[in-house]
A protein has these predicted regions:
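Outer-membrane beta-barrel translocator domains and adjoining extracellular loop/strand segments
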Residues: 22-29, 63-67, 72-80, 120-129, ...
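Gram-negative outer-membrane beta-barrel transporters
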Residues: 331-332, 336-340, 357-418
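Face-selective signature of the C-terminal outer-membrane beta-barrel domain
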Residues: 50-68, 87-247, 252-264, 268-272, ...
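Extracellular loop and loop/strand-boundary signature of outer-membrane beta-barrel proteins
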Residues: 31-36, 74-84, 97, 146-152, ...
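Membrane-embedded beta-barrel scaffold of Gram-negative outer-membrane proteins
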Residues: 18-20, 270, 278-282, 308-365, ...
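Residues that define the transmembrane beta-barrel architecture of outer-membrane proteins
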Residues: 1, 40-46, 86-92, 156-160, ...
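Periplasmic-side early beta-strands and strand-to-turn transitions of outer-membrane beta-barrels
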Residues: 1-83, 405
Length: 421
């Protein structure tokens, strides 16, 4: 540290190594004891930090980070012996903060991040191995232990993310906030071995850009009895790539540009100093993430034609709060909520590759109760009970005019009720 100049330096890192071999009885062959190995894992992380607190900005921070990861692929049903992956990530982050930026009452928070990753997956073994050690043919004439083809994948990604938050305090009753989140991602997957097996190229470069901008206005009374927060958002995203299936040779050009608006309002009213009522409603949009759109180049196929999720929601609740007013710091909260989600994005498995897809419409009705308290000076108690009824409300099967046979049915693999203690 250089304290008089407000400058701090930092350097750190860690190394992780795991290689846990163990024996177990085979669930596939009676009387056979197998050794589970090929699960080596290595990770190296090195990072640095530079902070300046006495420049024109209140805080200027730079952080470079390097991450290297190696992982053996361990089979569950099959005895994978050679397939493995490794990756390198180079990360650079910059953050700047300034109170009273350009004018009194205006606070700035700026964040910029760049990530470069190169991911490699190798599955070119000349044969597969049974649990008893005997060999049998690879998945293709070019080798491979997993899936339906050999693979020698390289996937390079460039990601750029920028966050900006400007908060302006007009006076004790009014404040305005502007926030912006911009993301850009470029992926370039290449797998010549897979192309050899299939006979044509299925992985192509992709470019994704998204921007979410929001403007928020808060009004609160001088006695803090009433607070209202009104928010509007603008959403934009574009995706340019080519998509080809491992089953269809022809590649489809994808050049998507979509935009939308969102609006929400939340309010709360203090009935007593410890009891408040709250409510909110909104129309929100969730843009597809970089992982959902670009996939990983191997197990997860790109989904450049995804549509943003759109959600209408209503929430009503009560909060009884004794935090700082009693030794128990008791909090009791009750909420009821309704959501209608369109174009829900979900992960769907496939015979050869999995992919994220738009599902359709889903309606949610729910209630939630939560109690938190300090039971003693050293014991904290927490219990949460949730009831959630999620229903498929699609009229038709996805992208067809065929009536949906599961309309009105509960969504699978989502619990109707749950309790956390």
């Amino acid at each position: 540290n250089i304290a008089p100049k407000g400058i701090e330096f930092g350097l750190g890192g860690f190394y992780t190594y795991a290689d846990n071999d163990y024996k177990m009885k085979s669930p596939f062959q009676e009387g056979l004891t197998i050794t589970r190995d090929h699960d080596k894992f290595k990770k190296t992380v090195i990072g640095g930090s530079f902070k300046a607190r006495k420049w024109w900005f209140d805080l200027v921070e730079f952080e470079p980070v390097f991450i290297h990861t190696y992982k053996d692929i361990q089979g569950i049903e099959s005895n994978i012996r050679h397939a493995h992956s490794h990756s390198n990530a180079f990360i650079f982050a910059n953050k700047m903060e300034k109170e009273n930026f350009l004018l009194d009452g205006l606070d700035l928070d700026w964040q910029l991040g760049y990530i470069y990753t190169d991911y490699h997956f190798a599955d070119t073994a000349s044969h597969r191995t049974h649990w008893d050690g005997t060999h049998y043919p690879a998945v293709s004439e070019f080798g491979g232990e997993i899936g339906k083809w050999a693979s020698l994948l390289t996937n390079e990604k460039h990601q750029l993310q920028h966050k900006l938050n400007l908060n302006y305090l007009v006076n004790e009753n009014h404040s305005v906030n502007f926030n912006s989140l911009l993301k850009y991602a470029h992926a370039n997957p290449r797998d010549g071995m897979k192309d050899k097996v299939i006979g044509y190229r299925t992985d192509f470069p992709s470019n994704m850009f998204s921007w979410v901008a929001g403007l928020n206005y808060d009004y609160r009374t001088s006695n803090d009895k009433f607070l209202n927060s009104f928010n509007v958002k603008y959403y934009y995203y574009s995706m340019k790539t080519r998509m080809a299936s491992v089953l269809v040779k022809t590649a489809e050009d994808i050049d998507t540009h979509k935009n939308d608006f969102g609006i929400s309002n939340a309010l709360r009213y203090r009935i007593t100093p410890s009891l408040m009522a709250k409510a909110s409603f909104g129309y929100d949009v969730r843009l597809p993430s970089e992982e959902e759109l670009l996939g990983d180049g191997y197990v997860i196929a790109p989904a450049g034609n995804l549509t943003p999720e759109r959600n209408i929601s209503v929430n009503i609740g009560m909060l009884f709060d004794l935090t700082g007013k009693a030794s128990s710091n008791l909090q009791i909260e009750l909420n009821g909520y309704y959501m209608h989600l369109k174009d829900m994005i979900r992960f769907t498995g496939g015979f050869l590759q999995s992919q994220y897809q738009n599902f359709g419409e889903m309606r949610t009705l729910g209630m939630e109760a939560e109690v938190k308290a300090d039971m003693t000076r050293w014991l904290y108690g927490y219990v949460n009970a949730t009831y959630q009824d999620l229903r498929d409300v699609r009229k038709y099967e996805q992208n067809t005019t065929v009536a949906n046979p599961t309309k009105g049915s509960r969504m699978p693999n989502i619990p109707l009720s749950l309790i956390h203690i």
